[in-house]
Amino acid sequence: MFSHDDARSRILAAACERVSAGGTAGASVRGIAADADVSPALVLHHFGSKDGLLAACDAHVLATISDFKSDALAQGPGMDLLGAVAQSSEIAAPLVRYLARRLVEGGAPVDELVDTMVADAHRYVRAGIENGVIRPSVHEQERTVLLTLWSLGALVLHHHVERLLGYSMLDGPEGVQRWSELGAEVLATGLLTPEAIGAARSQEATA
């Protein structure tokens, strides 16, 4: 998370909060500077421009989430996956809210953000395979993209998650853990019966 011991960290924290609340359009350099108790000139001194500040926010959010996931996977097959998710989501709730807002805005910076998350996810999956947590796949890259977009889609549609399931994914660990339990059930036990999978493959083979 952010250290508030220096001006740069305060600026990053203020920028993330502004983006979370009102998107990038509502995150003016002047407003961020006021929230961080610094001058607008100091914001530009550290980050060059508003775009530079947003890029730094993206990088910090990704690095923090990456650290959480890497620490969890390093525990190997005996890891408490859902516990790790709950603990990290409690710490990273402001960053999750930032991502949920940032992802809906589109554009090249968001494309780059998603591409980086897919690349990071591929690394986590490889580590999980090596540690015995995740099964290998002949479609490893495609599977990684699917899982990443599945997760990001839930963040973008968080309003409907709360409306239909009755809990928020953005306000702390409880909602994220409940969502993760549903996902873990699907991933661990599957959705289709072996007979249904066999029938689908037979149809593909004869198509």
Feature locations, PLM:
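Amphipathic alpha-helical interaction segments
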Residues: 10, 98, 116, 139-149, ...
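Amphipathic alpha-helical packing segments from all-alpha helical-bundle domains
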Residues: 65-70, 107-133, 142
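Short, Lys/Arg-enriched anionic-surface-contact patches
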Residues: 1-10
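Helix-turn-helix
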Residues: 10, 14, 18-52, 56
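Hydrophobic alpha-helical connector segments
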Residues: 56, 67-100, 140, 144
